[in-house]
Amino acid sequence: MVDILAAPQQTKADSALRTLTGISIAHWVSHFYIFVFPMLFPFLKEQLGVGYIELGFALTAFGLVSGLTQAPIGYLTDHFGARKVLLIGLAVGGCALIGLGLHLSYPALIVSAVVLGLANSVYHPADYAILSAHMDNARMGRAFSVHTFAGFLGGAVAPAIMLALVATVGGLGALIVAGAIGPLVALLLIAMGVPDTSAAERKAAGAEAPKQNIVTPAIMMLTIFFMLLGLSNAGISNFGIVALMSGYGVDLATANVALTAFLAASAIGVLAGGFLADRTHRHGQVAAAAFGINAVIMLVIAIASLPSPLLTALLTVAGFLGGVITPSRDMLVRNAAPPGAAGRAFGIVSTGFNFSGIFAPLLFGWIMDQHMPHWVFGASVVFMVLTVLLALVTERKPAQIPATA
């Protein structure tokens, strides 16, 4: 009898592990694709005879399209199935790169960036909808953390992979080979049997759509929360090296070590945060506490001249705490999403990250142009304080259960 009862549990556990593995691989592809164009900028500049402004416009097109289509793709995810949307996104994104490799021109680059941005918009709503439907609630935080870590890993290895491809098969070949990864991963997910969101959930979502207002105050606050998270991290990630070199007397090697420590600690923090998210229901307080400490750390960096070892140590702690809150951040969205609307909820709030990616380079670039490198960290403090306040406001209170006689 014990063996008969244990078999379904093992099968369910195996299915959950297979699902998490497949979705995490897809998220790896998402972040890998984000870095394909930037890694090929020297090749594209030489081949197309354009400047970095023209190449930057391709990234702007990617970001705008990805940001504006997240919410509509979330709607499609809830109504037609997350698995279908995810597979199409993988295939379309890959074909965008393959097409550019077969016919390289500046107009083709812009078209490819637009299509790649559209494909990129599927991952968050589709991935989180599948994970929310098929992961054990007791391990949901850890599932979200592994999924996020896989994305971090995709971005981390992209430079090495693209450089190796350019060295072996050239720039055009690198585009084609990188593009082939998307369709191949789509076939892998089919072979692995990654499940869809259930037909019952989609039917319920469709039946309730006219009555259901997904754009709730909590979802809108979380969208702003995501944007503030992006803004608070973007200055450090993108302008941290130049700020440390110009304002703190730090050499390039030391600045690189400090930023690498910050990013590596963030990835480790994501995994640790998954265990924490599964052991508490107070996800907003976890996020607020971690970012509150980070705000103090960044304030110290902004106003004090610190020795390089201490500066690196503080950035390492800040990176770890920034990673720790990520699973709790995702749990806040899941808790705020109405039943059957996880795809739409994650699609809407993820636009906050996309728009922070548009605004942050302008803001922090202006700060550096004004020769105020300390304000790269000072502005991050402001955004972190606002993030702390929103984390506390947006935490959804558990419903009160009426007492029974």
Language-model-derived ranges and their functions:
Residues 37-38, 218-263, 267:
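Extracytoplasmic gate region of multi-pass secondary transporters
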Residues 68-104:
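Conserved MFS/SLC helix-loop-helix module at the cytosolic interface between two early adjacent transmembrane helices
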Residues 35, 63-71, 155-156, 263-267, ...:
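Residue-level signature of mid-helix packing/kink "hotspots" within the transmembrane helices
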Residues 84-98, 285-300:
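Structural signature of the two symmetry-related core transmembrane helices
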Residues 69-81, 270-282, 368:
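Helix-to-loop junctions at the C-terminal end of transmembrane segments
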Residues 2-14, 196-222:
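Juxtamembrane intracellular "pre-TM" segments in multi-pass secondary transporters
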Residues 112-150:
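Cytoplasmic helix-loop-helix junction between adjacent transmembrane helices
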Residues 147-193:
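Helix-loop-helix hairpin linking two adjacent transmembrane segments in secondary transporters
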